[in-house]
């Protein structure tokens, strides 16, 4: 069973006792439950299972309650948070201060105690502290006893939730660069600061010759290769298309067959480089079996490779 990051729901409230907080408890928790239901029923993880939500044990009106909520979320494996409120709250005491969790704040557009002021104040606090948050506010005014989520608000919540889950799943994993700068394209220069500071990822790099080494030394699962080659013979080689090269530049049938074998092996090897492969350990290749913990990778397609050997188009399409 995969362990995916959950979304934490933070119901914040005006912490003043004596009638203020008490009058808002039920409303605020109802909004939190509605958000959790919305996300779990519409957003899924990559394997198709619903995204799990964790709601704070109670409303958050003071910093001690913020801390208790953060502790619970750490235990539960939360990877992103959305703060929900129907009223003014004390922003610096109730805001999510975790620097690694993607954040959103929904301020309820209500008739009596609108969340607009808190939304503006807490978003300013997030910006000042360098902890970006996505602000959500409804177009239409709702009655205080209306706990429904308007369509425009729901769309914003779901857009944020999908992005937040993706970012949370990337954190702690690697981007694997196979090769160096691609074809002189500045956009292919890997910005390690972006990956580390914005996505919480690390960067790994191997030379393109590692693919050739693994081919030459047979560092791939032969049984898996046979299955992959049979699939390719059936579904890909039969759709090669027309040969548009000049006759003197055209490859022979034997050369084309060799290219197909090459790109299939290349695909398996790139996958092994990214995620590792326990089968390689059984074959005696303990280091290669580990992989680079990569959730994404790029074959940089340097001319020194692509003018000489098959490029990575097939690998990229399959992966």
Where are the model-predicted features located?
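An N-terminal assembly and electron-transfer interface module characteristic of large anaerobic redox
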Residues: 1-319
């Amino acid at each position: 069973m995969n362990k995916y990051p959950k979304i934490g729901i933070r119901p914040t409230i005006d912490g003043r006792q004596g009638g203020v907080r008490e009058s808002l408890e039920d409303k605020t928790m109802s909004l939190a439950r509605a958000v959790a239901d919305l996300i779990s029923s519409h957003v899924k993880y990559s394997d198709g299972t619903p995204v799990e939500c964790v709601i704070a044990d109670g409303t958050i009106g003071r910093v001690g309650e913020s801390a208790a909520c953060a502790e619970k979320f750490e235990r539960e494996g939360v990877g992103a948070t959305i703060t929900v409120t129907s009223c003014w709250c004390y922003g610096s005491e109730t805001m999510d201060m975790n620097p690694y969790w993607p954040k959103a704040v929904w301020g309820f557009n209500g008739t009596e105690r609108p969340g607009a002021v808190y939304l503006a104040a807490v978003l300013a606090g997030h910006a000042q502290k360098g902890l970006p948050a996505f602000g959500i506010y409804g177009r239409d005014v709702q009655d205080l006893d209306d706990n429904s989520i308007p369509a425009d608000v729901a769309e914003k919540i779901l857009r944020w939730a999908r992005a937040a889950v993706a970012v949370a799943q990337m954190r702690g994993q690697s981007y694997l660069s196979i090769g160096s700068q691609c074809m002189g394209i500045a956009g292919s220069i890997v910005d390690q600061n972006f990956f580390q500071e914005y996505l919480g990822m690390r960067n790994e790099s191997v030379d393109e010759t590692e693919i050739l080494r693994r081919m030459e030394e047979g560092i791939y699962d032969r049984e898996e290769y046979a299955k992959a080659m049979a699939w390719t013979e059936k579904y890909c080689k039969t759709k090669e298309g027309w040969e548009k090269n000049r006759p003197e530049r055209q490859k022979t049938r034997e050369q084309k067959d060799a290219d197909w074998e090459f790109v299939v092996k290349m695909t398996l090897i790139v996958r092994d480089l990214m995620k590792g492969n326990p089968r390689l350990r059984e074959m005696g290749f303990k280091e290669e079996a580990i992989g680079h913990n990569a959730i994404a990778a790029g074959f940089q397609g340097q001319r020194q490779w692509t003018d000489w050997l098959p490029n990575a188009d097939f690998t990229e399409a399959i992966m």
